[in-house]
Amino acid sequence: RDRSPSRGLGDVYKRQIIAFGISSFFTLLFPIILMIVLVAKQKIAPRPLLIGMLAFFVSQILLRVPILNVLSTQSWFLSFAQQQMILYLVLLSSTAGLFEESARLIGVKCFCKEQRSYRDAFSFGLGHGLCEVILLVGMSSVGNLLYCVMLQNGSMEAAFADSPDLLQQVTTALAAVSTTSIYLGIVERVSAVLFHIFATVLIFQGVNRGHAGSYWLLAVLSHTVFNLVAVILAQYSNVWIC
């Protein structure tokens, strides 16, 4: 008799395969296609678009995330996160604002000296936001999709034959994922991209008007509030936030 962990969960995995498939399209393939089409039609400027993408990659992937990963191995930091949850969430939100808005400001002042129009600001913000979508949501959606497919066809059991406990953990975790949360994750990413465009316009305006510092501070505060609201919602509704 087949007693595999995925037995009886076929319908669940089918729904999740569909949901993760849709998420993978809208958070990985669609952003890439959108940028290619907009550049080809000259609706956006390629240089600010690329700089915006690099601003996110450097500030988050190369700097902030590794620092947080190191801190997460420290007992005092874990204790702080557990005992001071609100302050911990504020810290996460504010550091995202500090790192990303600082990178945005440096990108505009140092690498967009001749490209500071609204079109350039939109291009920069779109690149920043879509890079985040692709790296933090798109890639994980594809990974989860592959896991669900492997669980559905039974190949996951062969892959984890020597690690039944790990297989059980993966199976339980994926079975617990609500398809509603997957779809909400797509909506949340749309709002995040719109925010990145807004924040980029703020930085561009600050640089153009000679008030880069005050506009940068406004962008950091706005970013902190936006992320904090999203993180708090994630605690109660499982909305994805990155």
Language-model regions, residue ranges each:
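Short, small-residue-biased leader/transition segments that mark boundaries at the very start
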Residues: 2-13
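Hydrophobic alpha-helical segments at protein termini of multi-pass membrane proteins
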Residues: 11-242
